Amino acid sequence: MAAAAAAAAATEQQGSNGPVKKSMREKAVERRNVNKEHNSNFKAGYIPIDEDRLHKTGLRGRKGNLAICVIVLLFILAVINLLITLVIWAVIRIGPNGCDSMEFHESGLLRFKQVSDMGVIHPLYKSTVGGRRNENLVITGNNQPIVFQQGTTKLSVEKNKTSITSDIGMQFFDPRTHNILFSTDYETHEFHLPSGVKSLNVQKASTERITSNATSDLNIKVDGRAIVRGNEGVFIMGKTIEFHMGGDVELKAENSIILNGTVMVSPTRLPSSSSGDQSGSGDWVRYKLCMCADGTLFKVQVTGHNMGCQVSDNPCGNTH
């Protein structure tokens, strides 16, 4: 402190009376003070070089684990991208010259240039699937049916059958002439079998009239039981009408049954009772079939042997 005061006094004296010469002792004291101050300033900015005192740099702890997860995720995405690229290159065959398997046109047409293996095809609204001109469009199912479906309408092509399911009907027409070949719109078009179709197999048919060509017969065949029912009657007309069945024939009508023409019944096919049976024995009720002169058929219950058709309540009137 004394040295500092002396230096300050000397400075003031030098500033007021001009430069003052210092002694050797004063110069040594001043030099020592300067070195001491310099050393103290150097130590103030000194940092010990110890591992524990250094600032830790880099990703450590949770940040390091998160960085590893991000790197692994990027690696997985790169592998998936590589697999997708290989599939696109192998299936679509995209190369330096373009795509070898398909073509994209400005009109929106997608053309396949080779055999394509697909599962389900969903065309867009009002789209068309077709083949090239003068070439067939071949659609093949590998041990599976080929199904064309739009809403509730479905066309299924299987190995042994082809089925069409529709709630509103169907029609077939020539794509070139647009002539209707077959239609189920009975109110507008009469039902005709297409050319080459000889038989129609249905479980149930509701129609006003069933006819055949003038040069062919109309045959109705069933494996089990056939029921022909009309809301206002059933009329069967033909040159010759034959019924062949292995079981019973049942004719029911609310008013009457009219057989107009020659009616032939083969007695060899009719069941007959044994000659030894009594007329009144057992639970059987027997009837005799009788005919009037005008062709009216009626039945008479058999109550005794050698009984004829002459009964009082027969519908023939005076003529039997």
UniProtKB/Swiss-Prot annotation:
Q: Which residues are glycosylated?
A: 160, 213, 260
Q: Any ranges marked Cytoplasmic in the topology annotation, and which?
A: 1-67
Primary role: Component of the sarcoglycan complex, a subcomplex of the dystrophin-glycoprotein complex which forms a link between the F-actin cytoskeleton and the extracellular matrix.
Q: Which organism is it from?
A: Mus musculus (Mouse)
Q: How does it assemble?
A: Cross-link to form 2 major subcomplexes: one consisting of SGCB, SGCD and SGCG and the other consisting of SGCB and SGCD. The association between SGCB and SGCG is particularly strong while SGCA is loosely associated with the other sarcoglycans.
How does it get modified post-translation? Answer: Disulfide bonds are present.
| Gene of this entry | Sgcb
- What name does the UniProt record give this protein? Beta-sarcoglycan
Query: Can you tell which superkingdom this protein's organism belongs to?
Result: Eukaryota
